[in-house]
Amino acid sequence: MINEVKKKLQEELDKYLLDKAAFMPYYPGMNVFFSDLYKENLEAASAFVKSQNEAEVKNFNLYLDTIIVNMHTKVKKYKKSIYFDDENIKDIQNQGFSIPFFIDEGKGVYVLLGIVNSEITL
């Protein structure tokens, strides 16, 4: 399962490297962008959290949003991604999920590649 996850994340990174303009900002004017896989994974993660505890889904999304909005101030605290052998790809851990993101130093942006349920894939 982890190889399948790595492959999908790598495909999203490759898409970004080929066509940066195809990625949307997390919020207008932000230097955080998200991939299609991230959007799909967010919907699946929210559904999973809701199936476990319907009241927690709002807290999950709000806390994740807060982390992402403030991630630029804490980039150095995040560890190298377990899915890539690259110092420019790190993982944010949130409530049993990993959010791998790419640091595009040349453009000064961060790209959210996906959301992985750590308990299922590891």
What are these regions (language model features)?
Residues 22, 52, 56-60, 79-86, ...:
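Solvent-exposed interaction patches of small proteins and small membrane subunits
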Residues 37, 41, 56, 78, ...:
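A broad, structure-centric signal for solvent-exposed, well-ordered loop/edge residues
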Residues 33, 45, 56, 74-86, ...:
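Sparse, context-dependent recognition of short Cys/His-centered cofactor- or disulfide-binding micro-motifs
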Residues 39, 65-68, 116:
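Conserved protein kinase catalytic domain
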Residues 19-23, 66-94:
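A short, surface-exposed loop/turn module that caps and links secondary-structure elements
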Residues 1-9, 13, 21-28, 49, ...:
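Enriched for short, Lys/Arg-rich terminal
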Residues 6-63:
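Arg/Lys-rich, positively charged N-terminal/basic patches that mediate binding to nucleic acids
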